[in-house]
A protein has these predicted regions:
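Short, small-residue-biased leader/transition segments that mark boundaries at the very start
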Residues: 1-2
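A short helix-coil junction within the Rossmann-fold of NAD(P)-dependent oxidoreductases
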Residues: 7-16
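Active-site-adjacent segment of SDR/Rossmann-fold oxidoreductases
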Residues: 11, 30, 51-63
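Residue(s) in the substrate-gating loop at a strand-loop-helix junction
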Residues: 25
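Active-site loop immediately N-terminal to the catalytic Tyr-X3-Lys motif
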Residues: 30-36
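A transmembrane-helix-recognition feature enriched in membrane-embedded lipid enzymes
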Residues: 133-166
Length: 174
């Protein structure tokens, strides 16, 4: 990320206006169990983008830096991820593929159950760039999790971790 941006930045600065858009994740705003390595990378994207944005502003550059925090967007990210194993009762399976017996089924469910589509995400990003909002949340889930993590920083993670299990419990009884 850093190398690409240092290569492209001089070219972007020659334009009347330009934008650098880095994609983090809602897991770049808070962490959950079993996602520590992923969160480290996404928190890093957030920190890098915030620092870059300030540097560009201080140098009076015409380039703006934005950080996107998508929630659950219907993509193939889950089905293309590499897992050591997939267990139906595993927490990741409960979150991403609630009723799946295989990783492939979980990937399909993940995509189908997404509250946001890639097309919707693109529209939200463009709308926020036009408004000069540097921090862009994608999806109602991202807004909800962001708000809840701010309001209830200690209990939020416990609530989030148990929600999929409760949802599965009620689905199986109906």
């Amino acid at each position: 990320m850093y190398k690409r941006q240092t290569v492209f930045l001089p070219h972007l600065e020659k334009r009347p206006e330009a934008a650098i858009i880095n994609t983090s994740s809602i897991f770049g705003l808070f962490s959950v169990p079993k996602q520590s390595i992923y969160s480290v990378g996404k928190f890093g994207v957030k920190a890098f983008t915030e620092s870059l944005s300030l540097e560009l502003e201080m140098s009076e550059s015409n380039v703006e830096a934005y950080c996107v925090f998508p929630g659950h967007v219907g993509t193939n990210i889950y089905s293309s991820a590499k897992f050591k194993s997939f267990e139906k009762d595993d927490a990741d399976a409960a979150i991403f593929g609630a009723n799946a017996d295989t990783k492939e089924q979980a990937g399909i469910q993940f995509k189908q159950n997404a509250p946001s589509s890639p097309k919707h995400a693109a529209k939200v990003i463009l709308k926020n760039i036009r408004k000069k909002n540097k921090r862009i949340l994608i999806g109602i889930d991202a807004h909800f999790y962001d708000l809840m993590s701010r309001l209830f920083p200690k209990s939020f993670l416990k609530i989030i971790w148990i929600l999929p299990f409760l949802r599965n419990l009620f689905k199986s009884k109906n």
